[in-house]
């Protein structure tokens, strides 16, 4: 194949990925009980806020479901005997747009939720086809509602050459705003060497990468606590993939990628000190973090500060307090996790006593700086 810059691309082989967990494929499962009791009729995410929305509000964590994707998801859940979640089944582009208007969302940046059953069950070729289909559906939504949507294009990631072609198509043909990755693909987090050619191409393009977590195949219902593994495991998997990117040197080596992580960075704000303590060579003789050849030449805290984080399900005062200690608020964007959670989480942000400039940045300014097309 030929790369987008005209240079010959090295032929890469696909690699087997571990089977997806059959019990806790994503954050959706912690709501599955509500769906089983008929909560789908309520669709709480579609309720308008009683408090007026900001003049401009950009949601960088906004899910969408092409019909073929919904069908494949339903089949994967049937295979695993997982109850269907009503808000996902009820989603249509018309309902989603109506909900945005009611809640005062100016722009929603589209991304897929993490659904390993859809990705892995039929193999790399089917995953490639699904990624293409979803990209095209999302791009159509962007074209149909100018200024109201952006697109983080999903990549299949199971075959390197196919994924490089997907990147070229997403940016050069569909004009995607950025890329949508899962935190892991089977048994590999994003710092794994298998993904090196993919991330190098995204670095060359100075891409924004939005990372959405899922329950890892290692940590299904048999190893997690509680009825819904996603409640605990989803934020932990964000931490796993950030640490894999850190320790592999990817964050340092590929400086032109702009990373955006979900849910306030998972548990990174709470574990940052522990991570730094263990991998700082002053505390741990096996670490090689500092120095010109280290994975964190400016220190681990500096690497975490360079990343971007959204506020989806992270507006609790304790969570936001930790995030504020970790990064400047210029690195934080507004996210909702629609349709699983309400659009109006800005009300909780307004109760945190943030400076007016910081609040305005979270609501829209930081996203506009990260994704300049959204300024129009």
What residue spans do the PLM features occupy?
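A short acidic, glycine-rich active-site loop
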Residues: 81-90, 128, 231-238, 290-291
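Charged helix-capping and loop-helix junction motifs
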Residues: 127-134, 191-197
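Short glycine-enriched loops at secondary-structure junctions
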Residues: 113, 157, 213-217, 338-339
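Catalytic pocket-lining loop regions of alpha/beta-barrel enzymes
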Residues: 169-327, 331
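Short catalytic/ligand-binding loop motif for oxyanion handling, primarily in non-cytosolic enzymes
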Residues: 66-68, 116-121, 159-163, 170, ...
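Mid-to-C-terminal alpha-helical segments outside catalytic/metal-binding sites
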Residues: 2-49, 53-56, 60, 66-107, ...
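Short, well-structured secondary-structure segments
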Residues: 104-122, 126-127, 137-156
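Alpha-helix-loop-beta-strand connector modules within alpha/beta enzyme cores
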Residues: 132-144, 202-211
């Amino acid at each position: 194949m030929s790369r987008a810059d005209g240079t010959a691309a090295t032929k890469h082989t696909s690699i087997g990925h571990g089977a997806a967990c059959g019990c806790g494929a994503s954050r959706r499962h912690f709501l599955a009980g509500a769906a089983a009791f008929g909560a789908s009729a309520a669709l709480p995410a579609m309720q308008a806020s009683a408090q007026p929305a900001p003049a401009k509000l950009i949601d960088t964590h906004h899910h969408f479901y092409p019909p073929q994707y919904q069908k494949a998801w339903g089949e994967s859940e049937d295979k695993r005997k997982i109850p269907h979640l009503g808000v996902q089944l009820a989603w249509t582009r018309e309902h989603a747009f109506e909900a945005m208007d009611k809640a005062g969302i100016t722009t929603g940046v589209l991304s897929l939720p993490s659904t390993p059953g859809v990705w892995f069950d039929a193999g790399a070729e089917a995953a490639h086809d699904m990624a293409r289909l979803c990209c095209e559906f999302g791009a159509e939504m962007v074209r149909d509602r100018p200024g109201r949507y952006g697109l983080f294009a999903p990549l299949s990631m199971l075959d390197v050459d196919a994924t490089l072609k997907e990147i070229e198509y997403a940016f050069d043909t569909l004009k995607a705003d950025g890329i949508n990755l899962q935190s892991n693909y089977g048994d590999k987090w994003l710092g794994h060497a298998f993904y090196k050619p993919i991330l190098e191409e995204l670095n060359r393009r100075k891409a924004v990468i939005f990372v959405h977590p899922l329950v890892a195949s290692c940590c299904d219902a048999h190893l997690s606590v509680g009825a819904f593994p996603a409640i605990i495991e989803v934020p932990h998997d964000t931490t796993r993939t950030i640490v894999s990117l850190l320790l592999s040197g990817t964050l340092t080596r590929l400086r032109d990628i702009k990373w955006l992580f979900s849910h306030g960075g998972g548990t990174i704000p709470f574990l940052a000190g522990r991570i730094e303590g263990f991998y700082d060579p002053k505390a741990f003789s096996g670490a090689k973090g500092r120095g010109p050849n280290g994975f964190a030449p400016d220190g681990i805290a500096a690497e975490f500060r360079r990343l971007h984080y959204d506020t989806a399900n992270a507006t609790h005062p304790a969570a936001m307090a930790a995030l504020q200690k970790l990064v400047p608020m210029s690195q934080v964007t507004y996210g909702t996790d629609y349709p699983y959670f309400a659009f109006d989480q800005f009300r909780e942000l307004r109760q945190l006593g943030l400076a007016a400039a910081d609040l305005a940045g979270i609501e829209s300014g930081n996203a506009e700086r990260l994704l300049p097309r959204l300024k129009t």
